[in-house]
Amino acid sequence: HAGAKVAITQDLRWQRCHIKSTALLGNVMHFQQGYREGNAETILFNGDGQITEASSSNVFIVKDGEVLTPPLDNQLLPGITRMLVLACLQKAGIPHRESWFSVDDLNNADEVWLTSSGKEILPVVQVGDKTIADGKVGPVWEQAFTLYSKLKFEL
């Protein structure tokens, strides 16, 4: 996989993002804004500059070999793929934790991924105008994707 380019914008949706409902217009609007600009997805941050999720995905970063994803709360939807990826990381002993991280942390990450049922684990190589690390898919993503692919066939 060559990796994806994504947009980033402040999350202007209501503050009950953990409730999956039919009121997903805000998500669609964020996605369409990024898509019109040639992006695969749009990563969202809150008023404090912390990454929450993407318009239809959960967000992960890797820094110094450790995988981070925002903790579950009312600002993000608890994705099924997110849960499965965390289980794969745990089983394989890959360092990971649920922790808030900033836009700067995202921009300076070694790797960025998005997870969703449709995207599975999508490596991101560019966020806005910022290239992530060397602009190539990283080794921790490769390992996580292999583990996730095996898990899918075990279920």
Task: Describe the role of every protein-language-model region.
Residues 1-155:
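Helix-start/capping segments and mature chain N-termini
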